[in-house]
Design a protein with these regions (language model features):
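Charged, alpha-helix-forming regions
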Residues: 1-205
Length: 205
């Protein structure tokens, strides 16, 4: 991403949409806001487990890339993004060894198979939406060298709509990707969403 500002969706930053542990999680996430208006249910399938907060780095890359296109004046923003595994790993500050490519594919699988149901962004009372983070993805490997060459990922409608609505995006610190703990990442996202640049900070009870 270079000097490109990192962007993420406000709605996703403040709610528990992702597993905070790297080991496979199968137990669903059940969340309801204190006023009962906003709720989230996240479910995983046994084969792959739940999408993690580290997997979400791919969605941050997608949001940042689409936001750059938008800033450059592109009106018809694509829901399918094309890149190389190497460039994506470098952008989210990961290694580029063989294991890193395997973990990237595993992350794509979790993002595609994790199922979310939520009332967030509902336009009517008692309305809810169901989606996966990714609708589909491809990962191309050279037949002779077995080296990763290119890849695509297609965002779900819910994710895409949240990104192209520029007002729903917040800028994140470029060192966010260097945070190693799941709880650290979650706390940063919540604090960034609520405190932002307020001089008085934000009190969490």
């Amino acid at each position: 991403l270079g000097d490109l500002p990192l962007k993420d969706q406000r709605e996703v930053m403040e709610r528990p949409f992702f597993s905070l542990q790297k080991r496979k999680r199968l137990k669903p996430i059940e969340y309801r806001s204190p006023d009962g208006e906003a709720w989230v249910r996240v479910q995983a399938i046994p084969d792959y487990g739940m999408a993690t907060i580290w997997d979400a780095d791919i969605l941050i890359w997608a949001a940042s890339t689409l936001n750059r296109m938008q800033q450059q004046g592109l009106n018809d923003l694509p829901r399918t993004l094309t890149t190389t595994p190497y460039d994506l790993l470098r952008a989210i500050k990961r290694g580029t060894g063989g294991r890193d490519y395997q973990e990237l594919q595993a992350a794509l699988l979790r993002l595609q198979t994790t199922s979310i149901t939520t009332s967030i962004r509902a336009t009517k009372r008692r309305q809810k939406a169901g989606f996966n983070w990714l609708d589909s993805w491809t990962f191309d490997t050279d037949a002779e060298t077995e080296q990763p060459r290119g890849m695509t990922l297609t965002l779900s409608d819910w994710v895409y709509e949240g990104i192209v609505n520029e007002k729903s995006l917040l800028t994140m610190h470029p060192d966010y990707f260097l945070l190693s703990g799941g709880l650290e990442r979650a706390l940063y996202r919540i604090a960034r969403k609520h405190a932002g640049t307020q001089r008085g900070g934000w009190l969490c009870r």
